[in-house]
Amino acid sequence: MCSSDLYQNAGASIAPTAGDIFNDSDMIVKVKEPQSEEVSMLRENQILFTYLHLSAASELTKGLVKSKSICIAYETVTDQNNRLPLLAPMSAVAGRMSIQAGAHCLEKPQGGRGLLIGGAPGVNPGNVLILGGGVVGENAATIATGMEAKVHIVDKSEARLKELEMKFGDRIIPLVSDEINLKDYVAETDLLIGGVLIPGANAPKLISKEMIGI
C-alpha cells in the first residue's frame, strides 16, 4: 500500500473526497471503470482515462454519453503496430490465472472430476482447449504446457498459429478455427479457456450450453 505521505512527498495534494477531485481536475485517471456516483460527477469536456469495457455495460455507456465528458478506454489504446499495450498486461495475467483456477476447479474437493491436469505416471494428462491465440491464449498455453497438459489452441489466423508453434513446438496442437468442428473438440475437453478478443466489442459466443452439456 502507498501511504498518503508518499504521494505528498512526490508533490501530490490529497483531496478529502472524490468529489473534490472531480470538481478540481481537467483529467481523471483511474484503473477501474467509474462507479455510478462518479459518473454523475463528470462534466462536459472533462477527460476520463481508465478501463471502461463499455460493450458489456450499457448503463455506464449511457451515463458517460449524458455527461458529455471525453472518455478514453485503456483497453482500446493501440500503438504504432496496432497492438493493445495497456490491455496486454491484464490479458497476460488473465491467461495464466485461467489455467491455475481451472486446474483447481477440476479437483474433487471443488466439485470437479478429480483430474490432475498434468497427469501422472500411468495416467493421461488432461485436455485443455484454448480459444484464441492472442495474449490470453498464449499465456494460458504457457502455464498449461508447463503443467504438461495436452493443449489445443484454436485461432482463425494460420500465421498466428505458426508463431505459437515456433514458441511451443510439439507441446501444443494448433487448430485453424474454420477447419474444425468445435463441438467435437469441446466434448473431449477437460478445461476450456475462452480468449477471443474483438477490440471494443463483446467477444463472439462460440460455445453453446448444448456443447458443454448444460
Tell where the protein language model's regions lie, with residue ranges.
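Glycine/serine-rich phosphate-binding loop and adjoining beta1-alpha1 elements at the start
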Residues: 36-127
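Short beta-strand element of Class I
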Residues: 150-152
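An anion/phosphate-binding loop that grips the pyrophosphate of nucleotide cofactors and donors
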Residues: 24-25, 189
